Swiss-Prot record:
The entry's keywords: Cell cycle, Cell division, Cell shape, Cell wall biogenesis/degradation, Cytoplasm, FAD, Flavoprotein, NADP, Oxidoreductase, Peptidoglycan synthesis
Protein name: UDP-N-acetylenolpyruvoylglucosamine reductase
Entry keyword Membrane: no
Domain of life where this protein originates: Bacteria
Database matches in Pfam families: FAD_binding_4, MurB_C
Role description: Cell wall formation.
Residue ranges of every copy of the FAD-binding PCMH-type domain listed in the record: 17-187
Subcellular location per the Swiss-Prot or TrEMBL entry: Cytoplasm
One GO location term (cellular component): cytosol
Matching NCBIfam families: murB, PRK00046.1
Biological process annotations from GO: cell division; cell wall organization; peptidoglycan biosynthetic process; regulation of cell shape
Gene: murB
Enzyme class: oxidoreductase
Pathway(s): Cell wall biogenesis; peptidoglycan biosynthesis
């Protein structure tokens, strides 16, 4: 365990905004987590578990303790049909996917290059190119912050949805994910429905082929957060009614959409791009010129710049299409999680 007093959070969030915290503690084990949550010194302080900070925007000084998750380790067991991989929650997700591909554990390759750590994956139910975590997740192990006991949820108990899970609702602020177990079928079935992957639909395609192709696609479309500060997709793809979709198609016949149970899922990046916002900039914050769904820190952005830009994008899309975008990125103001409308009101009133 390592304790840092009133230090900058810049190295610990992929937006690279220069906010700070009262206290930063690095937790290297489950016992460290138990010690932190049971220590009377921290009882009245807000405590935020943080993995890679790849889906987080600190909007001002964090009044409390930021606990860096540095729980590492991997183990593999198997049945006749599946590999079961138990992954500690601090493991880097992109490195994990590459390790799986290199070691013959197929079925995870579509989730290549998604920034973050393994413990964050079930919170958001991360997904890309036709695959979601829920499709390969066997169970999630977590530390109950009330009892300080380790508990486990089966896949069905995690209540996975589109960028949703029980960890964002019923168990929010009540647990820390300590490990996940993945179930990967030994009989690999590639997921190639996504357009650019269609040229891999032949009998000779391997998991490495799919992994390499997805890395190529993502490298072209998405900026590397190690080079350009960003949190990946800033907004969720909205779901609208069939009637709303048909009405929009009269004006925008090329509007891309996908059938879902609730109606039509619309590509948020297309909405932003079609609104002419690619490259739009507010001080150091900018809509990425290649992928409109990504907001970037060009090097000098403050959290306020990013909030102003996000609010402008949200309002522009609402005015143009009558669609309200919901952000994927989680915002923290005064040590508490908040939302874009609240944060904008806080900054401008």
């Amino acid at each position: 365990m390592q304790i840092l007093l009133n230090k900058t959070l810049k190295p610990y969030n992929s937006f690279s905004v220069n906010e700070s915290a009262d206290l930063i503690i690095q937790a290297d084990s489950i016992q460290d987590l138990i010690d932190i949550w049971s220590d009377k010194k921290y009882t009245d302080m807000t405590k935020l578990p943080l993995g890679r900070g790849s889906n987080t925007l600190f909007c001002n000084h964090f009044n409390g303790v930021v606990v860096l998750n540095r729980l590492f380790g991997k183990s593999v067991t198997e049945t006749d049909t599946d590999y079961l991989l138990k992954i500690s929650s601090g493991e880097d997700w992109p490195a994990l996917v590459e390790w799986c591909v290199d070691n013959g554990f197929a079925g995870i390759e579509n989730l290549a290059m998604i920034p973050g750590c393994a413990g964050s994956a079930p919170i958001q139910n991360i997904g890309a190119y036709g695959l979601e975590l829920k499709d390969i997740c066997e169970s999630v192990e977590y530390l109950d912050l009330e009892t300080l006991q380790i508990k486990t949820l089966k896949n069905s108990e995690c209540l996975f949805g589109y960028r949703e899970s029980i960890f964002k609702h019923e168990l929010k602020d009540r647990c820390i994910i300590t490990a996940i177990t993945l179930r990967l079928n030994k009989q690999w079935q590639p997921v190639l429905a996504y357009g650019p992957l269609s040229d891999l639909r032949n009998s000779k395609t391997t998991p490495k082929n799919v992994f390499d192709k997805i890395c190529e696609i993502r490298s072209k479309k998405l900026p590397d957060p190690n080079v350009i500060g960003n949190a990946g997709s800033f907004f969720k793809n909205p779901v609208i009614s069939e009637e709303h979709y048909l009405a929009l198609c009269e004006t925008y016949p090329n509007l891309p959409a996908y059938d879902v149970t609730e109606g039509k899922k619309i590509a948020a990046g297309w909405l932003i791009d079609n609104a002419g916002l690619k490259g739009f900039k507010i001080n150091g914050a900018q809509v990425h010129q290649e992928q409109a769904l990504v907001l970037i820190n060009t090097g000098t952005a403050t959290s306020e710049d990013i909030l102003e830009l996000a609010n402008h994008v949200k309002n522009s899309v609402l005015d143009m299409y009558d669609i309200e975008l919901e952000h994927e990125v989680r915002f923290y103001l005064n040590g508490e999680e908040s939302f874009l409308s609240e944060l904008f009101d806080e900054r401008t009133h």
